[in-house]
Amino acid sequence: LQAAKGTNVQVFVSTFYAEGGNKTFDDGIKAYINGNADAKTTNGGDDTISAVTAMGYDVYYVALEALKAAGSTDPAKVMEALPGVTYDGVSGHIAFDETGDAIRDTAYIKTIDTAANVWKFVTQQKAS
């Protein structure tokens, strides 16, 4: 985001979380960022919520569920258990296929408004 500021570059990204997708999560993360100068600095100087923050939050809890389902910390057992794990997180419903890839039904397409230095929502894509 910072690298594109003031340029005429066009960047489009797809993500599994759009800011505003979970008000409770957004409010909590923004309160943390705005209440911690270091967090705000490392967040680019503002309280924009990146999708990776929400997905990182979810992956922590998904990993805990996978460890519980496996009854072990052995990587092979966790991978074996993963297809049976589902989780309703801040970024939506998360499930896994037989190889451990996430099954998601919605992606959000965003672009950068280089003048305002913010992400702009473009469209939502739903799996058919």
Show which residues each predicted segment covers:
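Extracytosolic ligand-binding ectodomains
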Residues: 1-128
